[in-house]
């Protein structure tokens, strides 16, 4: 066992990924059910988009050579043959010396190779005067200029979002092959933990971590209905729960029992599981230091801290990367960072990478970052935070006015 020194969580996790079995089973789903799923194949375009040349402006479809030398003093005068309606394929061609009105997005008629903007024209029935010349292709979008037939649209391993769904629909692709969602078993541990709908007796506390983790990973994974959800600090109960979970789950997570006192029990139970190994125990981060990452039969086991804030940070930095990897994602770091200016001075322990809960004022440029100074176990500030400011391990804090990297929540 060794401490994992995190500068980039995804970068530091890369060496252990090969110990885990990725999801290989796939299924076909409608694009209307594909948001948040991991694409299991490369998606290529089967057609040119647009399929025909279109106008990018309101104006007149012309043969560009008919406008050569046109100016306000010596306009080109073309015979108006008719109008093109949006969404219709023109039924007539234009010959030299002719033009047709065309709206933005209209399909160019045969014989036209450019569009004169309406601002540079004047209709004098039955003619239209053109006050400037246009080059071939001007104010048009050509077939395949947006998407070419055979073009790679979305690569395998992409986590599909709204923008991808829109592209698929635009390209006429209505079903996609995605990886099966990884099955995730989530447990909370500890004699002091009671269900959220209970009134805790003195010395007890409601389970915050279980619901939080289910919300965090319920989009990308299938959360299993395990029993018991809360495991007491008893070896037999923990061993039974983990063995049963590993029979049905792709990933097992448990929070609590990973810090001093009960952590030895968790480590001991994991070691007793078939084909298991503790890959690392403890991270040089705060909050989130007492984290266990293990493997059993190619399946990840994550032992997360008991404090909700510590559990959240560890699950975000470590759990997210592992779950996305197992699910088939090709993303290396599924986080969004910004840079801002810290408002007040803060201190941190050297050698520890600290993630500080902060409020962000986006009305300033660059954004102003205000620390929410509190203990790692305080839950309220986590819910109110806009982001986590990263203090590098080589620093002993940040001075007011110093630039800081912030992971958005």
Model-predicted regions and their roles:
Residues 1-74, 329-357:
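Short, low-complexity N-terminal leaders and the immediately following helix N-cap/first helix
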Residues 2-4, 60-229, 373:
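Short, glycine/charged-enriched hinge/interface segments at domain edges or termini
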Residues 2-10, 174-304, 308-314:
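Helix-rich terminal scaffold detector
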Residues 3-10, 14, 25-28, 32, ...:
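Electropositive phosphate-/nucleotide-binding environments in soluble metabolic enzymes
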Residues 27-32, 41, 87, 147, ...:
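Flexible glycine/proline-rich
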Residues 34-48, 88-101, 293-294, 298-300:
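Short, hydrophobic/aliphatic alpha-helical segments
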Residues 53-55, 70-73, 91-95, 108-110, ...:
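Solvent-exposed alpha-helices and their adjacent loops that cap or buttress functional pockets
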């Amino acid at each position: 066992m060794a401490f994992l020194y995190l500068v980039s969580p995804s970068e530091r996790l890369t060496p252990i990924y090969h110990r885990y079995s990725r999801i290989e089973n796939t299924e076909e789903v409608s694009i209307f059910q594909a948001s948040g799923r991991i694409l299991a194949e490369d998606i290529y375009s089967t057609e040119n988009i647009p399929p025909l040349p279109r106008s990018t402006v309101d104006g007149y479809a012309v043969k560009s050579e008919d406008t050569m030398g046109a100016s306000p003093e010596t306009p080109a005068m073309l015979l108006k043959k008719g109008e093109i309606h949006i969404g219709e394929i023109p039924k007539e061609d234009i010959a030299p010396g002719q033009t047709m009105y065309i709206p933005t997005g209209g399909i160019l008629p045969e014989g036209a190779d450019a569009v004169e903007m309406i601002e540079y024209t004047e209709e004098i029935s039955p003619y239209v005067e053109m006050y400037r010349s246009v080059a071939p292709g001007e104010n048009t979008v050509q077939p395949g200029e947006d998407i070419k037939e055979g073009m790679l649209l979305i690569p395998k391993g992409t986590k599909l979002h709204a923008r991808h769904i829109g592209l698929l629909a635009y390209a006429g692709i209505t079903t996609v092959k995605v990886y099966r969602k990884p099955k995730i078993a989530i447990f909370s541990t500890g004699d002091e933990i009671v269900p959220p709908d209970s009134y805790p007796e003195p010395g007890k506390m409601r389970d915050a971590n279980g619901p939080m983790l289910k919300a965090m990973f319920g989009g990308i994974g299938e959360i299993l209905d395990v029993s018991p959800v809360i495991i007491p600090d008893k070896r037999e109960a923990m061993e039974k729960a983990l063995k049963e979970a590993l029979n049905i789950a792709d990933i097992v997570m448990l929070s609590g029992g990973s810090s001093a006192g009960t952590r030895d029990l968790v480590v001991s139970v994991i070691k007793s599981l078939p084909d298991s190994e503790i890959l690392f125990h403890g991270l040089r981060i705060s909050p989130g230091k007492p984290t266990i990452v293990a493997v059993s039969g190619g399946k990840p086991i994550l032992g997360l801290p008991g404090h909700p804030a510590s559990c959240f940070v560890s699950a975000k930095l470590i759990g997210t990367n592992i779950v996305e990897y197992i699910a088939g994602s090709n993303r290396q770091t599924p986080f969004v960072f910004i840079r801002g200016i810290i408002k007040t001075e803060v201190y941190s322990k050297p050698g520890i990478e600290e993630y500080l809960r902060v409020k962000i004022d986006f009305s300033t440029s660059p954004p102003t970052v205000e620390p929410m100074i509190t203990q790692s176990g305080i839950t309220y500030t986590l819910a109110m935070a806009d982001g986590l400011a990263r203090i590098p391990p080589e620093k002993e804090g940040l001075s007011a006015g110093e630039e800081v990297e912030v992971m958005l929540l």
